[in-house]
Amino acid sequence: PVGPSAIAANGKSMALNRATGQPALTQCEAPRALSTAEVKGVIGEFVQAAKNAIAAGFDGVEVHGANGYLLDQFRCPFLNDRRDEYGGSLENRCRLHLEIAREVAAAVGAERTGIRLSPHGQANDMRPDPEPMATYGYLAEELQKLGLAYLHLYDQSTSWVHDPDDELLRLIRGKFTNALMLCGGFTGRKAEAALATGSGDLIAIGKPFISNPDLVSRLRQGVEIASWDSKTFYLGGHSGYLDYPTFSA
């Protein structure tokens, strides 16, 4: 694996067990730090992937800058101890987000490009940003300059995106004036409330789609959302994939 620096995550990640052919949790390895030239290559890979998606018929692309994945690792001062243009200052640690977003937008159109961030996120052994207001205020302001179609905010805690008075949410909302998408613990009622208060313009829903094959109908009719079994998320076969029932009216 590669990363901004040779700092391993504590804990385990999902990988394929070659002996059984099934996914299993394995201890995280220490990544190899990308060279500056390799980082430039990563930008090119994002651009090519975006072009491929549009050529395949997708309406747009979303740059994944959240949840402890590569871009989020570059942002994190606890995982990024680089001494080049991608490390050190807040601006340098956010540089990869902005360069990729800029190049992808130039390649496929800003109106077809969004980006996802996860303020306060602790997924995949991430630690909270020590300066969230400064970091995400800067990112929101710079991303607005690119004219992206939307900014997608994921809340792992499923708390702050539901609070229209949350200080960070209000800051981001003020600096990024294009469409704002919110994600994290939304039900139909909570989604309607967030839209009504103007906290967000779009609501994203993830895991409920796994356990609710009729999710859209449930939301329209106000039916309770069925819970999911996270133990089946990474298994092969139909269990936890094709066996969730629809609701009975």
Residue ranges of model-derived segments:
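Flavin-dependent oxidoreductase catalytic cores
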Residues: 1-249
